[in-house]
């Protein structure tokens, strides 16, 4: 008989006392359920003084925003914990610290990050963290290189691909990124004023052909252990610090997907800034986002290449020039997946505050149309955008 049961606040406190690695566990007395996502319960465990000391996260057996009509495997909690532990092995400074996890209860205890802020919220408020893009690039380079064929033995990699097979969560990504936005589906969510743009996307055969190629690569390219959902809402930042959280979508997939999703979320903020700030602040913020995406790719690519030169285990993959050739394909994948993120976050199920929090209706629609137009451009032109400078030029041309 399964030990699984949905935690109450009292259950979360007791669990944190046992597994929170707190010197004075009985000091933990209350729990606040703070989960704002679709898949989990998240409790902040506080002491008598009201200070948050540790986080308890439990997977629910269904999609929270839909209900029990959309069931989900609880094994995703194991995959999330093990993904974070693996990523933490290679990049501890930028991965949330997992203190304990229990696969049967689908629960994880992790460090409290109350001294950090969610990066998306800070971007929407116009607060700039100049080191964040480079730190995210370091996280991506370290975690993706060390779980790839460049570093892992073929036997270890194949075993890991099996261990991290995550079909139900991948199905969500496959549907929300590559299928739903291009068909009439009940999960789609968009302003009726955008219907002409939505219909144009559905009828764009060249776009749908390019999206089919992106989906096929997502389905078939087990290049590294991805975070799988690395957007600005799954990243905590503080001055000089950054940590990735929420890795339940982890699986072995195309490296460009994680990189492209990260780039796409910076560009969602770029598209939303005219509606989030006055003209001068919006213009300055947009230049910051372009600087961020430049730093993100340049730092990631240089770091990944350096790791390949230093640590590649396979003698064939160590052939001079191969890592750079491989990285060029990662880049083109990333540009395409970046475009997919722009489109699906605008008209699909899961939106972002960078666009949806814009108060003025007409300005919000203009920013959403920009995101759709830019997303389409990037998907269609990915194979012809050869460098980060080319990408930035395309972004400027698009508005």
UniProtKB/Swiss-Prot annotation:
EC supergroup of this enzyme: transferase
UniProt binding sites for ATP: 40, 57, 111-113, 246-248
Catalytic activity reported: 5-(methylsulfanyl)-D-ribose + ATP = 5-(methylsulfanyl)-alpha-D-ribose 1-phosphate + ADP + H(+)
Pfam families: APH
Domain of life: Bacteria
Gene Ontology terms, MF aspect: ATP binding; S-methyl-5-thioribose kinase activity
Binding, substrate: 229, 344
Cited InterPro entries: Aminoglycoside_PTrfase, Kinase-like_dom_sf, Methylthioribose_kinase
Keyword Ribosomal protein recorded: no
EC number(s) stated in the UniProt entry for this protein: 2.7.1.100
GO BP annotations, alphabetical order: L-methionine salvage from methylthioadenosine
Pathway(s) this gene product operates in, as recorded in its UniProt entry: Amino-acid biosynthesis; L-methionine biosynthesis via salvage pathway; S-methyl-5-thio-alpha-D-ribose 1-phosphate from S-methyl-5'-thioadenosine (hydrolase route): step 2/2
Keyword Phosphoprotein carried by entry: no
Entry-linked SUPFAM superfamilies: Protein kinase-like (PK-like)
Keywords: Amino-acid biosynthesis, ATP-binding, Kinase, Methionine biosynthesis, Nucleotide-binding, Transferase
Similarity section: Belongs to the methylthioribose kinase family.
Its biological purpose: Catalyzes the phosphorylation of methylthioribose into methylthioribose-1-phosphate.
Subunit comment: Homodimer.
Name by which UniProt lists this protein: Methylthioribose kinase
């Amino acid at each position: 008989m399964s030990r699984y049961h949905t935690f109450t606040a009292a259950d979360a406190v007791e669990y944190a006392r046992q597994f929170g690695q707190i010197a004075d566990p009985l000091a933990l007395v209350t729990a606040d359920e703070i989960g704002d996502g679709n898949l989990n319960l998240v409790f902040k465990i506080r002491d008598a003084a009201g200070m948050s000391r540790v986080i308890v996260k439990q997977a629910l057996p269904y999609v929270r925003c839909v209900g029990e009509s959309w069931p989900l495997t609880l094994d995703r909690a194991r995959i999330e914990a093990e993904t974070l532990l693996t990523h933490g092995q290679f990049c501890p400074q930028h991965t949330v610290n997992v203190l304990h996890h229990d696969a049967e209860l689908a629960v994880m205890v992790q460090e409290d990050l109350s001294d950090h802020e969610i990066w998306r919220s800070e971007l929407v408020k116009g607060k700039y963290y100049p080191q964040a893009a480079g730190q995210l690039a370091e996280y991506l380079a370290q975690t993706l290189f060390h779980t790839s064929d460049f570093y892992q033995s073929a036997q270890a990699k194949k075993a890991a691909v099996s261990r991290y097979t995550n079909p139900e969560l991948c199905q969500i990504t496959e549907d929300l990124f590559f299928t739903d936005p291009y068909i009439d589906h009940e999960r789609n969510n968009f302003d009726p004023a955008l219907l002409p743009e939505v219909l144009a996307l559905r009828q764009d055969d060249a776009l749908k052909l390019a999206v089919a190629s992106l989906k096929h690569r997502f389905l078939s390219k087990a290049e590294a252990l991805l975070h799988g959902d690395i957007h600005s809402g799954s990243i905590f930042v503080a001055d000089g610090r950054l940590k990735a959280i929420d890795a339940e979508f982890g699986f072995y997939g195309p490296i460009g997907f994680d990189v492209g999703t990260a780039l796409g979320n910076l560009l969602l903020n770029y598209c939303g800034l005219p509606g989030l700030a006055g003209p001068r602040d919006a213009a300055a913020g947009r230049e910051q986002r372009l600087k961020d995406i430049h730093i993100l790719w340049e730092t990631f690519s240089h770091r990944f290449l350096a790791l390949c030169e230093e640590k590649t285990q396979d003698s064939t993959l160590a052939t001079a020039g191969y890592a750079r050739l491989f990285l060029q394909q990662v880049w083109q994948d990333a540009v395409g997946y970046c475009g997919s993120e722009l489109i699906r976050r605008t008209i699909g199920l899961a939106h972002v505050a960078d666009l949806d929090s814009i108060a003025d209706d007409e300005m919000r629609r203009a920013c959403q149309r920009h995101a759709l137009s830019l997303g389409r451009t990037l998907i269609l032109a990915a194979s012809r955008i050869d460098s980060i400078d080319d990408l930035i030029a395309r972004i400027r041309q698009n508005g």
